[in-house]
From Swiss-Prot:
EC number, UniProt record: 2.8.1.-
GO cellular component terms, semicolon-separated: cytoplasm
Pfam families referenced in this protein's UniProt entry, alphabetically: ATP_bind_3
Keyword set, alphabetical order: 4Fe-4S, ATP-binding, Cytoplasm, Iron, Iron-sulfur, Magnesium, Metal-binding, Nucleotide-binding, RNA-binding, Transferase, tRNA processing, tRNA-binding
Cofactor(s) listed in the protein's UniProt record: Mg(2+); [4Fe-4S] cluster
Lineage summary: Bacteria, Pseudomonadati, Pseudomonadota, Betaproteobacteria, Nitrosomonadales
Other comment: The thiolation reaction likely consists of two steps: a first activation step by ATP to form an adenylated intermediate of the target base of tRNA, and a second nucleophilic substitution step of the sulfur (S) atom supplied by the hydrosulfide attached to the Fe-S cluster.
Single GO term (MF): sulfurtransferase activity
Domain of life: Bacteria
Purpose: Catalyzes the ATP-dependent 2-thiolation of cytidine in position 32 of tRNA, to form 2-thiocytidine (s(2)C32). The sulfur atoms are provided by the cysteine/cysteine desulfurase (IscS) system.
Main location: cytoplasm
Family from the record: Belongs to the TtcA family.
Descriptive protein name: tRNA-cytidine(32) 2-sulfurtransferase
Subcellular location: Cytoplasm
Amino acid sequence: MGTGIEMLSRKEQHNANKLHKRLRRLVGTAIADFNMIESGDRVMVCLSGGKDSYALLDILRSLQAHAATQFELIAVNLDQKQPGFPEHVLPNYLTSIGMPFRIVEQDTYSVVKRLIPEGKTTCSLCSRLRRGVLYRVADELGATKIALGHHRDDILETLLLNLFHGGKLKTMPPKLVSDDGKHIVIRPLAYCKEKDLAAYAEMENFPIIPCNLCGSQKNMQRQVVKEMLQQWDKKFPGRLENMFSSLQNIQPSHLLDSSLYDFHGLKTGNGPVVDGDRAFDPEPFEPGVEELLSLNKD
């Protein structure tokens, strides 16, 4: 764990310990559910200087110290040469906690500013350039896994962005093969809420570095979706949890993709399809009602 918790009051320390245990449990569960980290892995943790990647590194360090599975960690930061970037912050922090690290200097900032018109979203190109550099570094370091700091809210935002603007039911997977086909990319924070990570980063007093390249783009589509999800979370408790659960409860027979379900070959006599012609029921009927409905089918 980081150094911030020791400076808290007893009550704050109790809450911080509870939060750390919850996050560690969620990360451990995600790792187990998707077989993210295996014995002997060398995990390259991509550290941006933001709250999420700090929390990711801290929690993985905690799991490394207590888990039966033996794996290595190395932190990697890409210095994109953004104006005003405090180059000393990450090396000082990583040295202070005894974490092996590598700082990679690559001026992707100038490339993005040159190619993207003023006022347009830079995130897509910036991300593409950053991925290419990180894949190369993973090769150089002999990393078997690349760990990114995307969390539950990022996954939900991406789901809605694809739905609203891409015409796809698609989001960030917890584990994937990289674009170059040579690396396994993992997202151990997949089950963690952003607000929990923000609270944890504040409690641990991580030396946060703001992103000057894209952080001020308030009108970009992702920011609009983020704010919408935050409003839903306040107004409709449990909605985000249900949305996230739906990503683990897919029923191809009740969608419209014939590549996932054989609608052409659908025939009677093979038994009912799960949920049949029931499109949506907000909650199960009482047992007596279910029995009556069953009798009406006969």
